[in-house]
Each structure stands twice: as C-alpha cells, then as structure tokens.
Amino acid sequence: MNEVFNFSAGPAMLPKQVLRQVKEELYSWNNMGVSVIEISHRSKEFLQLMQEAKQDMRDLLDITENYEVLFCHGGARAQFSAIPMNLLKTSSERVDYIITGYWAYNAAIEAKKYCDPRIINVVGEKNGLHNIQPISKWDVSENSLYIHYCPNETIDGIAVYETPNFSDKIVVADCSSTLFSGPLNINRFGIIYATAQKNIGISGLTVIIIRKDLLKEPCLVVPSILNYKILADNFSMFNTPVTMSWYVASLIFKWLKKQGGLKEINKRNQEKSALLYDAIDSSNFYYNNISLSNRSYMNIPFFLKNSKLNDLFLKESISFGLHGLKGHKVVGGMRASLYNAMTLEGVKKLIRFMKLFSEKYR
C-alpha cells in the first residue's frame, strides 16, 4: 500500500506507534475490559494516567516546582480571553501584544474586549522577504504588566528563535505549534500555553504552564472554567475533562521520551526542515517568502512561481500520497507542516513529488 503522509497544520499527523496503541487499547484499556473514552475521569486508573502525564511533561520540559501544569478543555483561542481576565487587576492596565502574524494579531483583537492592549508590529520586509525584528528592538512599554507573543506563526511560517528576557514583566507565549519540538527555557516565561492538535495529540485539549505566583483570584469577572486558580485547585478537573485527548497526550509524552527527549526531537526537526527548504530554494520553480533567520521549521509555506498550477499540484499530491498541503486562505500557496510525528521519509517523499511535478510542468 502506498504510504500516506499528512502535512496538515492541525489536527496533525500522529506517530504511527501511538495510533497503533490507541487502536489496540480502544476497546479495552489497561486490561479493564472498558475503553479509556468511557471510564470515569475520577477512577484511580485515570487519575494515575493524569499524574503520569503531568510528570512526563515536567520531565520532558524540565519544568521546575514553581510552575503549575494545567490541562484545559478547548483550543488555544479560549486562552486569548483567559489571559487578560486572569492577569489584569483593572481594564486600564497597560499590556503589550507583539504582532508576528495571524495568531498573535487575533490574540490582541480578543484582548481588546478586556483592556486596551498596545499593539506592537515587529514584522518587516526586505528584498521581498518577511522578517521579525530582534527582541532588543521591540518597542516594549516600560510599565506594561505583561507581554504576549507567538514564537511560531503556523499560517505565516515565520518564527522568533530568541527567548525573551523581561524580568520586570510577565511573558506570555502561545507555543501551540512549537511546544515539545525542542528544549525551552521555561523559567523565562510567566505563562506558556499550547493547543494539543499539533505536537501533543488530538484536538480538544490545551496545556498551560503557569508560574505559581500568578495563580491568584482574578480581579475581573472570569468564568469558572477559565479561572486558572480554580483549575489548579481542582487538579484540572473542575469539569469533566476531555479524557480521550488527555489519554493521547499521555501516549505522546511516553513516545517523546522513547525517542530520546526534546534535544533529539529538535535535531530531527531541523534536519527535516533543512531538506525541504533546500529543495524549495534550489528548484527555480517554488519559492518561500520568509527571511532565513525567521523561517519556521514547523510550518513551511511555499509557492509555485506559476500559481495557475496550484490546483493541479494539490490534486496530484493527494494521488501521490501527500495530504494537507494546501496553504491557509489568508496566505495562499502551499504549506507543509513538519511536526514531531512527521518522518524524514515523509519529507523525502514530498521532495520527490515536488521534483517530479516541476520537471513535468516547467
């Protein structure tokens, strides 16, 4: 059978080993004779799964004890509201939103419902290539309570590889597409959040890493389900959690450990993206519009110089066993998402197809 590879930005490809385990355990999990999707979330077996998942997450990311790990329902968009509601004392407090692309901008727009965020655009263009200013040049307010940014924009394919170091501010990061793709200095951040359907498993779950001193009763009115203190006090079980998503995340964490941890995963991710970028740059048929220093290694947009071939490229790529390559409607073109589960073989197959297609229609 022709092996199929899924390059979708999310929900994204899962490791084959994890998919097989889910299939094997779906009808009878943990030798219980019942499925993990029907077991009580307060059973001792599921509570053990939860504790192991949190510990594995701490081990992988080297999360220190002054941080809490929360497993929340829903996607990252919910956190666009939850963050200002949980952190602000009044709606007049100054906050900074660094705009690196589509998702950072959407977070800022949502924050406007609760405060007057200062929007700081750090994206520029030189010689037709988009770039991001170095952090040292970001025009951050002296008196802002927190700074929010997105280190990797999945739609734009642009990334910030520096880690902010603002000791006098709460640094909040939407790491939905990069968390677990490599090591991260957690202690530079106040809050990190990431939706699961990219590198953590399946949709329905968002993980939050929050400094414990920020777990205070909010001053603004916050729905209980978005109240970080309530979630922490109830061990992320204030409501019935998305048990299937928690279960798959727990398998992903075990899989990451078996692969050698995040340094090894990052090495593989760098290798995969380097191969694809090289194929794009050397083709004279495809192109990428991001500067070298800000190219994402998770989400790689590329364009055909003859855009009239776009539909044909997508049609033939599916026949070749390559799915999810259509670019986002905001950007257009193509996009290959190379999350942790994407194999080197999958990237090489994409490159083979791109070469064959270019030779056929050049």
UniProtKB/Swiss-Prot annotation:
Its EC number is 2.6.1.52. Signal peptide: none annotated. Pyridoxal 5'-phosphate binds at residues 76-77, 103, 154, 174, 197, 239-240. L-glutamate binds at residue 42. It holds the Pfam family Aminotran_5. One of its GO terms (biological process) is L-serine biosynthetic process. Transmembrane segments: none annotated. Its cofactor is pyridoxal 5'-phosphate. Its main location: cytoplasm. Keywords: Amino-acid biosynthesis, Aminotransferase, Cytoplasm, Pyridoxal phosphate, Pyridoxine biosynthesis, Serine biosynthesis, Transferase. The modification N6-(pyridoxal phosphate)lysine is found at residue 198. GO terms for molecular function: O-phospho-L-serine:2-oxoglutarate aminotransferase activity; pyridoxal phosphate binding. It is found in: Cytoplasm. It catalyses: O-phospho-L-serine + 2-oxoglutarate = 3-phosphooxypyruvate + L-glutamate; 4-(phosphooxy)-L-threonine + 2-oxoglutarate = (R)-3-hydroxy-2-oxo-4-phosphooxybutanoate + L-glutamate. It is an enzyme of class 2 (transferase). One of its GO terms (cellular component) is cytoplasm. Pathway: Amino-acid biosynthesis; L-serine biosynthesis; L-serine from 3-phospho-D-glycerate: step 2/3; Cofactor biosynthesis; pyridoxine 5'-phosphate biosynthesis; pyridoxine 5'-phosphate from D-erythrose 4-phosphate: step 3/5. The keyword Plastid does not apply. Binds 1 pyridoxal phosphate per subunit. Homodimer. NCBIfam families: PRK05355.1, serC_1. Belongs to the class-V pyridoxal-phosphate-dependent aminotransferase family. SerC subfamily. Catalyzes the reversible conversion of 3-phosphohydroxypyruvate to phosphoserine and of 3-hydroxy-2-oxo-4-phosphonooxybutanoate to phosphohydroxythreonine. This is Phosphoserine aminotransferase.
